[in-house]
Regions:
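Solvent-exposed loop segments that connect transmembrane elements
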Residues: 42-44, 93-98, 151, 202-212, ...
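Outer membrane beta-barrel
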Residues: 45-104, 108-141, 258-275
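Exposed, low-structure sequence patches enriched in small/polar residues
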Residues: 3-13, 23, 116, 170-203, ...
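Aromatic- and glycine-enriched pocket-lining scaffold segments that form the walls
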Residues: 113-160, 168-180
């Protein structure tokens, strides 16, 4: 919303990054950052920057597959229990799902929320069996009222006095592990996490947030599985928490080399909650969602790639701006042309329909909301230093005149 006069610092963004790398075995580095509007070396940032991050990652040293000290990220299975990855959403190509990496990774970005601070390690007990363990102890931003945590603040912005008062008010501890077994075409894994806060977590549980977590001690446990046979691939994960459960299963089939078909089914119960989960879906959390997603990718001609998808989803419980269970659809078609390695372009059309409460009806009337998006993007790289990206976007929102 622009620079506000209530901000405590200058309207300048600044960050410093340092990375040391030795082969593919050792990574070390640090990050310092202040957002625009945050003070530097003053007030609540008397040590200079607003955010500091340090990490050390050792990997692929015999049976020691990875060892992280400092800030790190985690991802296991399909992300129903644990994932701090930066996912690209449903518009990602079908083939990209096979390239998703899991395990322990260094946290080298300026993201002030999606990371852990402590130690994590993965050890290969045998060629087929590996074990991971991790522990994290870190401060978090939030709001505390009468000794209870009422909300967790995720933006990492501390520009005004109100935002600065939320800084580092909470302490979270997390511990857990993963056991993974792989033999030929089969892979099995178990992931468990247990986390606590230094104060009771008691957000306001009303309306659509009625089934969110509350208390002080939380856990999640999930089993992930995968099987490959010739041109078939099946992957999935099923998880439970203090209440509710979630399951995501994906089937891929490639009848010929240039065609891939994918079917994804997810079921996230309205009362399932995993604070560090991040997976495939329409919503931003692994909760209160069911759906079937179908995708088809093909490269019938040289330099051309086509992708078509359709998603039919529903929300069994209330959502933001909809006071009853609802449903929707999401369709996409995209054509990508890559004449050279340094030049590519695509044209994409997307159609989405969801339901919303009619303004002023207090949830008694709902309307379908339609979103049409047309995008053209051109990417060009002259060399390793200079590159350009041009995007043309058209968006149109509308609703029916009568309530549904």
């Amino acid at each position: 919303k622009g620079y506000e006069h209530t901000y405590l610092g200058p309207s300048v963004y600044n960050s410093v990054k340092y990375t040391f790398r030795y082969r593919d075995q050792l990574y070390a580095g640090g990050v310092a950052e202040k957002d625009a509007g945050e003070p530097f070396a003053a007030l609540h940032n008397r040590y200079g920057y607003d955010y500091y991050s340090f990490y050390l990652l050792l990997q692929n040293c015999g049976r020691l597959k990875s060892l992280a000290v400092g800030n790190y990220r985690l991802s296991f299975g399909q992300g129903l229990v644990m994932s701090t990855d930066y996912l690209m959403g449903k518009t990602i190509y079908a083939s990209s799902f096979n390239n998703r990496s899991t395990g322990i990774k260094r946290h080298s970005s300026t993201d002030e929320y999606n990371y852990f601070r402590g130690v994590a390690t993965t050890v290969a007990l045998t060629k087929r069996l590996s074990v991971s363990a991790f522990y994290s102890h870190r401060n978090m931003d939030g709001v505390v009222t009468d000794g209870e945590i009422t909300s967790v603040y995720k933006t990492g912005l501390h520009r005004s006095r109100k935002e600065a008062d939320k800084k580092n008010l909470l302490t979270s501890q997390l511990t857990g592990g993963n056991v993974s077994y792989q033999q030929n075409h089969i892979r099995l894994g178990i992931t468990g996490v247990y986390y606590v806060f230094n104060r009771p977590y008691e957000p306001e549980l009303t309306g659509y947030s009625k089934y969110n977590i509350h208390g002080n001690h939380f856990y999640n446990l999930g089993i992930d599985y995968a099987y490959r046979w010739r041109r078939f691939s099946f992957q999935g994960e099923t998880a439970i928490g203090k209440q509710g459960w979630a399951s995501l299963n994906r089937l891929q089939y490639s009848p010929v080399q240039d065609i891939q078909f994918m079917l994804i089914h997810r079921f996230y119960s309205y009362d399932y909650w995993a604070m560090y989960a991040h997976s495939f879906g329409e919503g931003s959390t692994v909760q209160n969602e069911q759906g079937y997603y179908v995708g088809l990718e093909t490269t019938p001609f040289s330099h051309w790639r086509f992708f078509v998808s359709f998603d039919l989803f529903s929300f069994p419980w209330k959502k933001y701006r909809i006071n009853k269970p609802s449903r929707g659809t999401d369709g996409l078609i995209q054509a990508t042309f890559t004449p050279r390695t340094n030049l590519s372009m695509y044209l994409k059309y997307r159609y989405k329909q969801k339901e919303r409460d009619l303004t002023g009806s207090k949830g008694t009337l709902t309307l379908p909301i339609f979103h049409h998006q047309l995008r053209y993007r051109l990417n060009y790289s002259l060399n390793d230093v200079f590159s350009s990206r041009t995007t043309l976007d058209y968006n149109h929102f509308h609703s029916q005149d009568r309530a549904a």
